[in-house]
Regions:
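FAD-site-proximal beta/loop scaffold in flavoenzymes
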Residues: 217-249, 337-393
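Glycine-rich Rossmann-fold phosphate-binding loop(s) that bind the pyrophosphate
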Residues: 116-119, 257-258, 388
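A conserved FAD-binding loop/helix module that cradles the flavin
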Residues: 264, 389-415, 420
Length: 427
């Protein structure tokens, strides 16, 4: 506590705060840091909650070094304010001590269905519930959280932290339906028939890309996000160890160099892999992963092969992977023994909802097309979309930023429709 207050006191309270400019959701960082420096933890949390529904998550997984902390003027000649650690401290302190309890708003403005409970879905639900909407989330998994629960390792984002943030949503009046797949159990039309005024698609990108090389479809080639999900289920006691795939002594290669690649590589080490090497077609300076994530991976024993590609994968007569062929930028090839290849090359939206709903247009890669006014509405009236299903895979906070804008669009749309209905009713 003392350390957090002292760190907050280093803030210069700039007239034009660059930290706020660097934050995708425009957090009022100097304001809550000032309250923290004065020991007013409750006031600080009130300010944070005005912009973020997931402070304990953002305090852990946001790329602070590229955003708020990277813009801090103190960082030009020394160490910038540790904004992420301060946000994490406040969110955890609030979670443990119950600093604030938000008042439930009367739910009088309409009903909104949210499909998916990842960062975008949770942000929509929190924002609209605070504005007086009845919000119900439809989640296909047995537990909500999406990528927060199943795609980020426990060592980076403990599952109990995610559960705590979701509990806050439920305390706002948000209802969550588990194990319910829209496009299978119900359609979008079914939801409208149930009386929802608007529907939000926050389903992310669950359809994996294929590895288009010889041997790219053999046993042992897996999606990195699939692997992370299996490990998460195993850690929660919902999956047998043998179903996680990577075992002690395995030799593993990871394709890609974003944060998901770092997560997969470090998790493979934790699961007992003998060796893990990340293969990336560009240089270290061009990787999308945070430098801090890369540094941690190196410390834990992950190897890196730069400016190279895996161009072939070989298997034995039983179809089990035996080796990979790696080609560098000069065209030189070498063969390495391998048991598994994890692909961290991104993914695309699943078509389950679009294929069962008339009027929702997508681009040639399956991403949902939306418009600016009202922000986030698809080509189907009353159906909105945001986050990765529209903008391609990105960070948690960027999905949140987009979702906050969509929440405004939904509120404007529902209010306008109800006003028009009221006028017609008076005629």
């Amino acid at each position: 506590m003392h350390e957090a207050i002292e760190e907050a006191k280093r803030c210069l309270h700039c007239k034009i705060p660059q930290c706020k400019k660097g934050c995708p959701i425009s957090h009022d960082i100097p304001d809550w840091i000032h309250e923290l420096s004065m020991g007013n933890f409750g006031n600080a949390m009130h300010i944070i909650n005005e912009k973020s529904n997931l402070p304990a998550v953002c305090g852990r997984v946001c790329p602070h070094e590229k955003q708020c902390e990277g813009h801090c003027v103190l960082g030009k000649k020394g160490q910038g304010i540790h904004v992420g650690k301060l946000e994490r401290f406040l969110a955890d302190f609030d979670g443990n001590m119950g600093l604030i309890r938000e008042k439930l708003q009367p739910k009088t403005r309409g009903r909104v269905a949210v499909i998916g409970s990842g960062p975008a879905g949770l942000t929509i639900a929190g924002d609209l519930s605070r504005q007086g909407f009845n919000v119900e989330i439809f989640e296909m998994e047995l537990e909500p959280g999406g990528v927060l629960m199943f795609g980020i390792p426990e060592y980076r984002l403990p599952k109990d932290i995610v559960r705590r943030e979701i509990k806050k949503m439920e305390e706002l009046g948000v209802i969550i339906h588990y194990n319910t797949t829209i496009g299978k159990d119900y359609t979008v039309d079914d939801l409208f028939a149930q009386g929802f005024d608007a529907i939000f698609m926050g389903t992310g990108t669950g359809r994996p890309q294929k590895l288009q090389i010889p041997g790219g479809d053999i046993k042992g080639v897996r999606q990195a996000i699939w692997f992370l999900r299996r490990v998460s289920l195993y850690n929660e006691g919902n999956l047998d160890r043998k179903e996680v795939v990577i075992e002690k002594g395995d030799r593993c290669f990871v394709i890609g160099c974003g944060n998901t690649a770092m997560d997969a590589a470090r998790t493979a080490i934790r699961m007992g892999a003998e060796s893990v090497n990340v293969v990336y077609r560009r240089t270290i300076n061009e990787m999308s992963a945070l430098r801090s994530e890369y540094d941690d991976a190196v410390k834990e024993g992950v190897g890196f092969i730069w400016e190279s590609n895996i161009v072939e994968i070989h298997s034995n007569d039983e179809g089990k992977m035996t080796e990979v062929v790696i080609e560098d930028k000069e065209g030189n090839r070498r063969i390495e023994k391998a048991d598994y290849v994890l692909m961290a090359l991104g993914s695309a939206p699943a078509s389950r909802i679009v294929s069962t709903t008339k009027g929702i247009d997508v681009d040639d890669r399956g991403y949902v097309i939306t418009r600016e006014k009202p922000y986030g509405m698809t080509t189907r009236q009353g159906v909105f979309a945001g986050g990765d299903v529209v903008n391609r895979p990105s960070t948690v906070v960027l999905a949140m930023r987009d979702a906050k804008m969509v929440a405004e669009g939904i509120a404007q749309y529902v209010d306008a429709v109800k006003l028009l209905d009221a006028i017609k009713g008076e005629e």
